[in-house]
């Protein structure tokens, strides 16, 4: 089996919430993408319930793109502790952490249900599984803890 970076990361050593550059990959025709770990919850201690995670996913898809160019995708981890963010550009982790902080602040302070993109049966594959209350609560928890630009040493932005 292929070695997968996230399965080699020592999840007992990281200190969430944080942003981590997992890797840069060069494509066979020359393009480069960057893969980030946006870890919101401490692994093996807590996880984000699916409704809140789903709502954060929809909001991040739009709000993070408002702040950072070149985002290809933002997708939740199966363990429900954070997200992969794939970008055409390699940003330093402090820049990504600041964008994430601004995004979570907007979610906590001003987002209403009508602001969430893609929450109808026509535009979402599981449209009934959203929770703005949970997304706002997690935004508050994450912001209160502070987002670090380093996964192992707290460097809060």
UniProtKB/Swiss-Prot annotation:
Binding site for Fe cation: 54, 58, 124
Chemical reaction(s) catalysed: S-(5-deoxy-D-ribos-5-yl)-L-homocysteine = (S)-4,5-dihydroxypentane-2,3-dione + L-homocysteine
Cofactor detail note: Binds 1 Fe cation per subunit.
Domain of life, source organism: Bacteria
GO biological process: quorum sensing
Keyword set includes Lyase: yes
EC number, as in UniProt: 4.4.1.21
Cofactor: Fe cation
UniProt keywords, alphabetically: Autoinducer synthesis, Iron, Lyase, Metal-binding, Quorum sensing
Molecular function GO labels: iron ion binding; S-ribosylhomocysteine lyase activity
Residue ranges the record marks as coiled coil: none
GTP-binding listed as a keyword: no
Class of the enzyme per the UniProt entry, highest EC level: lyase
NCBIfam families per the UniProt record, alphabetical: PRK02260.2-4, PRK02260.3-4
Family: Belongs to the LuxS family.
Subunit and interaction comment: Homodimer.
Function according to Swiss-Prot or TrEMBL: Involved in the synthesis of autoinducer 2 (AI-2) which is secreted by bacteria and is used to communicate both the cell density and the metabolic potential of the environment. The regulation of gene expression in response to changes in cell density is called quorum sensing. Catalyzes the transformation of S-ribosylhomocysteine (RHC) to homocysteine (HC) and 4,5-dihydroxy-2,3-pentadione (DPD).
Protein name according to UniProt: S-ribosylhomocysteine lyase
Gene encoding the protein: luxS
């Amino acid at each position: 089996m292929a070695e997968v970076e996230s399965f080699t990361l020592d999840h007992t050593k990281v200190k969430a919430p944080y942003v981590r550059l997992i890797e840069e990959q060069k494509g066979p025709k020359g393009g480069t993408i960057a893969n980030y770990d946006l870890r919101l919850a401490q692994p093996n201690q807590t996880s984000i319930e699916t409704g809140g995670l789903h709502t954060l996913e929809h909001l991040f898809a739009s709000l993070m793109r408002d702040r950072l160019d070149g985002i290809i995708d933002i997708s939740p981890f199966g363990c429900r502790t954070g997200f992969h963010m794939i970008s055409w550009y390699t940003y330093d982790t402090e820049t990504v952490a600041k964008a994430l902080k601004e995004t979570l602040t907007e979610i906590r302070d001003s987002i209403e249900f009508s602001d969430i993109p893609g929450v109808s049966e026509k535009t979402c594959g599981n449209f009934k599984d959203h929770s703005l209350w949970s997304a706002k609560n997690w935004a508050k928890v994450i912001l209160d803890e502070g987002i670090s630009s380093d996964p192992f040493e707290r460097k809060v932005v």
